[in-house]
């Protein structure tokens, strides 16, 4: 009994230590990401509010830092949860995190779906390369022919909006929608095509969002892997936490049928985190 009790105590201590180490690593990595992306935004707003002349350090933002931070932290959380064993080979892990086609626009890969493709043997396939190059060509068409041409109209209309009437402003809005679509969809096609040439199938990240039938359906089609990352690593842990359960009971007790505030609060928290993952701008 004594040995069993001691073993349980050691196991509990190890579990607690693992929890704190995981939390520390998450805090440090997301803290670095926030500091790099928000330092100029914070300095500008402090100067605006208080009339100061504070200047932030001039640092270059590492290429793709958001994507490989989210991807590596998702891996860390999965290992902590025991979903799979950690890969102790640093070079294999570096390959998983920094696979070059997905650095700029994603998708945010999951270790269990991507690692086996990266580490396995790949044979030469002319058909696969042709398919990948065709997809890349289609992506460049969206970017160069659609997005860049629409950007000319957008820049002119919104750069000199005082000179244009309602119909032309509406045309500028429509062209901006085309520009966004061409930039993101075209970029994803190039990424998927380049990966296909290497025999790697990445997760779908963009699925005809302008054909969505509702706002919810739209968000399930646009930047899909970021949405699923937020769902798995933010929404569910946040929703099932003790604090949110207590808040839910409080809402039901004091608001009755209006306890939906609890549900909307969870979605607001996730959408806030999702918006903060992009570069901030002051309107």
Where are these regions (language model features)?
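Membrane-embedded transmembrane alpha-helical bundles that form the catalytic cores
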Residues: 1-283
């Amino acid at each position: 009994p004594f040995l069993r009790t001691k073993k349980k105590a050691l196991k509990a201590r190890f579990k607690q230590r693992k929890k704190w180490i995981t939390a520390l690593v998450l805090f440090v990595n997301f803290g670095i990401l926030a500091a790099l992306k928000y330092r100029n935004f914070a300095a500008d707003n402090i100067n605006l509010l208080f009339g100061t002349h504070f200047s932030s350090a001039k640092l270059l933002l590492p290429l793709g830092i958001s994507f490989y931070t989210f991807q590596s932290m998702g891996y860390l959380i999965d290992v902590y949860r025991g979903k799979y064993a950690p890969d102790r080979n640093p070079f294999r892990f570096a390959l998983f995190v920094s696979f070059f086609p997905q650095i700029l626009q994603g998708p945010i890969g999951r270790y269990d779906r991507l690692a086996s493709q990266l580490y396995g043997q790949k044979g030469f396939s002319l058909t696969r390369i042709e398919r990948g190059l065709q997809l890349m060509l289609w992506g460049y068409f969206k970017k160069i022919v659609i997005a860049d041409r629409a950007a000319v109209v957008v820049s002119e209309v919104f750069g000199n909006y005082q000179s244009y009437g309602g119909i032309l402003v509406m045309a500028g809005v429509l062209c901006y929608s085309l520009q966004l679509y061409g930039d993101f969809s075209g970029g994803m096609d190039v990424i998927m095509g380049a990966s296909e040439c290497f025999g790697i199938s990445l997760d779908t990240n963009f699925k005809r969002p302008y054909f969505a039938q509702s706002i919810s359906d739209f968000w399930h089609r646009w930047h899909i892997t970021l949405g699923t990352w937020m769902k798995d690593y933010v929404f569910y842990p946040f929703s099932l936490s003790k604090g949110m359960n207590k808040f839910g009971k409080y809402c039901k007790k004091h608001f009755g049928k209006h306890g939906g505030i609890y549900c909307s609060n969870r979605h607001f928290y996730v959408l806030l985190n999702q918006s903060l993952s992009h570069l901030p701008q002051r309107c």
